[in-house]
């Protein structure tokens, strides 16, 4: 166990949620099952009208390390995450979507990998598409230049609360891609993002569940994030971003355009996506 783990820092697990009580309970249970015991769970209920409020009241009675905040009106994912962070008391913050699951050693392993000079730590993810699962193996170290091609981190990291506060938290003006935007700002100010060499999260990729961020906002958010950061990008990064924007918009991008737009280090990934996904 590292010196950092011997100091036993408190980790705040932040979970925004909206109308997914059954999935939320599963997500919370995966945090309660962590090998790292010094955890608080901060849930922000974004004005759910299902059984979420009752579920949270029951769980808070059963587990003293759970706290919840309820938005009177739906305010979206970014606002809900910021509220959770503001109400957290841990030195470290780790996010979890309400339909995803942490593996039991996630927090312990991420803490063990965190060190000065890095903005955050992520892990490999198991992507659950329902009928099939794919393990997303990420680069051991993800730099700002890597991120300016696309979001190579995914949807969650473990980082210090003070780092998130220093860069201003999640951008509430973005309708989506708020996580991607935050990773860019963290990497810009605090260094690259490290990947723990383990698969520590199961990400629900099913498209039939109501989300706190609607699919209607996905394209708008991606474009807004690109516009916000394109001044940092070189020509190759901009070209690849335009290619991914077309994919996000549902355009049928041919092989020739793919080879013209995709840098060599990303070609295998794009060929695999085009053939099998």
Please describe what each predicted stretch is.
Residues 140-225:
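Conserved nucleotide-sugar donor-binding catalytic segment
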Residues 1-32:
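N-proximal low-complexity "stem/linker" segments adjacent to membrane-targeting elements
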Residues 30, 37, 45-54, 73, ...:
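A conserved acidic beta->alpha catalytic loop
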Residues 2-6, 181, 188, 199-277:
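C-terminal subregions of glycosyltransferases and related glycan-biosynthesis enzymes
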Residues 71-88:
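Glycine-rich, basic loop-to-helix element that forms the pyrophosphate-binding segment
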Residues 22-25, 50-59, 101, 105:
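Acidic helix N-cap motif at the loop->helix transition within catalytic regions
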Residues 93:
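Short aromatic/hydrophobic "clamp" motif used to bind/position activated sugar donors
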Residues 105-135:
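Conserved donor NDP-sugar-binding/catalytic core segment of glycosyltransferases
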């Amino acid at each position: 166990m590292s010196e950092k783990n011997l100091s036993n820092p408190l980790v705040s697990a932040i979970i925004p949620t909206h109308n997914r009580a059954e999935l939320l309970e599963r997500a919370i249970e995966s945090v309660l099952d962590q090998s790292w015991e010094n955890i608080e769970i901060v849930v922000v209920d974004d004005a759910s009208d299902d059984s979420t409020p009752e579920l949270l009241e029951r769980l808070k009675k059963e587990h003293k390390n759970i706290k919840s905040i309820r938005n009177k009106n739906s305010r979206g994912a970014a606002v809900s995450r910021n509220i959770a962070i503001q109400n957290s008391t841990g030195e470290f913050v780790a996010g979890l979507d309400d339909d995803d699951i942490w593996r039991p050693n996630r927090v312990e392993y991420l803490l063990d990998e965190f060190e000065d000079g890095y903005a955050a730590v992520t892990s490999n993810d198991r992507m659950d598409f329902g009928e099939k699962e794919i393990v997303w193996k990420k680069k051991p170290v993800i730099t700002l230049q890597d991120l300016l091609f696309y979001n190579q981190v995914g949807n969650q990291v473990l980082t210090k609360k003070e780092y998130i506060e220093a860069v201003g938290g999640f951008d509430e003006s973005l309708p989506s891609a708020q996580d991607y935007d935050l990773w860019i700002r963290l990497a810009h100010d605090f260094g690259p993002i490290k990947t723990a060499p383990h698969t520590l999260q199961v990400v629900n990729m099913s498209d039939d569940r109501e989300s706190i961020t609607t699919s209607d906002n996905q394209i708008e958010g991606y474009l807004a994030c690109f516009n916000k950061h394109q001044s940092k990008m070189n020509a190759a990064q901009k070209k690849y971003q335009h290619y991914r924007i077309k994919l996000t918009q549902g355009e049928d991008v041919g092989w020739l355009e793919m080879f013209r737009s995709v840098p060599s280090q990303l070609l295998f990934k794009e060929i695999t996506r085009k053939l099998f996904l």
